[in-house]
Amino acid sequence: MGDIINGKAESQKYKDKIIEFINERKKQGLDIPCIASITVGDDGGSLYYVNNQKKVSESLGIEFKSIFLDESIREEELIKLIEGLNVDNKIHGIMLQLPLPNHIDAKLVTSKIDANKDIDSLTDINTGKFYKGEKSFIPCTPRSIINLIKSLNVDICGKNAVVIGRSNIVGKPTAQLLLNENATVTICHSRTQNLKDICKKADIIVSAIGRPGFITDEFVNEKSIVIDVGTTVVDGKLRGDVVFDEVIKKAAYVTPVPGGVGAMTTTMLILNVCEALK
């Protein structure tokens, strides 16, 4: 029987550090971090995510400004809004909820965010710095993943790691963070052959494909650290890529869904905006 990686408990450790940071800034009469979150349209998933971010931010003493825009907003109007936030000294972090409506060029719009306020690491500037190993904001979900693995006090150096999924938001940056820790990384995707055999040999498995119940106990070994990034709503319940009840009986460590990676992500976002002030 393996151990559960408790994302909520690990997240609380970072929250305690954030509260300490905020209290110290208040004592010194310094600015309190403020996040501006932009949502275009009324996508239910995005609204839930934003409301959760706001709730967590404010509970930690972070100011959170929610900006909700009609789906019909013109691209130039959205850019003008972002440019205004860029020069607003009271705003320290800008988040643009994706996806955007089809009539808006997401790549163009995200490029307009000031790289120093790009706490979700969407701009090409921060992406380039990240992959070159220069100081930059680390994407929130990959940062959550690597910190959860490190919380186990396992030496990542030399470990065989498999990342299933090659998205620019999760898969690729997670692979890069594992490389930075000197793991030997294999990125798998929908065209990968013999996926089950590849995973069986891995010390670390990160699944980020959004296919509920895809990873069974046949994919893991007794030493596997399994990180489930999948979040798919099935019959009103959130489900991960991993068949948790099966895999926990065989692998060494497994993250639950919910209560694993997702519990860390918003905290990492807030950590990024705090670091923007340092």
Swiss-Prot record:
InterPro entries: Aminoacid_DH-like_N_sf (IPR046346), NAD(P)-bd_dom_sf (IPR036291), THF_DH/CycHdrlase (IPR000672), THF_DH/CycHdrlase_cat_dom (IPR020630), THF_DH/CycHdrlase_CS (IPR020867), THF_DH/CycHdrlase_NAD-bd_dom (IPR020631). Its EC number is 1.5.1.5, 3.5.4.9. NADP(+) binds at G165, R166, S167, S190, T231. SUPFAM superfamilies: Aminoacid dehydrogenase-like, N-terminal domain, NAD(P)-binding Rossmann-fold domains. The keyword Cytoplasm does not apply. One of its GO terms (cellular component) is cytosol. It catalyses: (6R)-5,10-methylene-5,6,7,8-tetrahydrofolate + NADP(+) = (6R)-5,10-methenyltetrahydrofolate + NADPH; (6R)-5,10-methenyltetrahydrofolate + H2O = (6R)-10-formyltetrahydrofolate + H(+). Keywords: Amino-acid biosynthesis, Histidine biosynthesis, Hydrolase, Methionine biosynthesis, Multifunctional enzyme, NADP, One-carbon metabolism, Oxidoreductase, Purine biosynthesis. Pathway: One-carbon metabolism; tetrahydrofolate interconversion. CDD domains: NAD_bind_m-THF_DH_Cyclohyd. One of its GO terms (molecular function) is methenyltetrahydrofolate cyclohydrolase activity. Catalyzes the oxidation of 5,10-methylenetetrahydrofolate to 5,10-methenyltetrahydrofolate and then the hydrolysis of 5,10-methenyltetrahydrofolate to 10-formyltetrahydrofolate. NCBIfam families: PRK14172.1. This is Bifunctional protein FolD. The lineage of its organism: Bacteria, Bacillati, Bacillota, Clostridia, Eubacteriales.
